[in-house]
Amino acid sequence: IKLRHSLGRPSRSDFVQSVFVEGEVMGLLDRLKLNKTKDFFEWLDLILKNELNSEIKAINFNLYEDTDNKWSVELVGTFSFDKDNDDWACDEVFTTRDHPFVIECESDWELVETFFIGLVNEYLSSGKYAGKLKEYQAIGIGFFDGDLQILYAR
């Protein structure tokens, strides 16, 4: 496993440390989460500390399978939300497409989706700007060509 995000690369010792915790080998999700939670929070903080487009009604985290075992997530702000129709996520008025959060890992899409859902849920629980996110009508996540899951709705 190689881990990378758009803010930099962890060292070999970071990787070794992430594999062994108290002498036990951890599962893939645990290893990824150990290394990536802080990085993901920093990425989101950099985005959310700024004023976002006032037309945004809902937020979606688009997931992508890139090449060479890379997976990325972008934050998208949309001008609509419809709990019965996932097409609301296409109504983009804001996106971080040019600056996604990227991980590198050999895995299937379902495990990667579970990983990113965990990161977003953790941010919604304890992230610096969680309250700002919760001001929107809804927060969804999913692969851009698949079904969305609503993680938060008010």
Please annotate each region the language model reported.
Residues 71-110, 151-152:
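Intrinsically disordered, low-complexity regulatory segments enriched in Ser/Thr/Pro
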Residues 1, 12-25:
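Short, Lys/Arg-enriched N-terminal segments with co-localized hydrophobic residues
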Residues 25-34, 38, 42, 49-52, ...:
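Acidic, proline/glycine-rich low-complexity IDRs
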Residues 64, 76, 104, 115, ...:
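A structural detector for beta-sheet-dominated domains
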Residues 46-85:
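Amphipathic, interaction-prone secondary-structure segments
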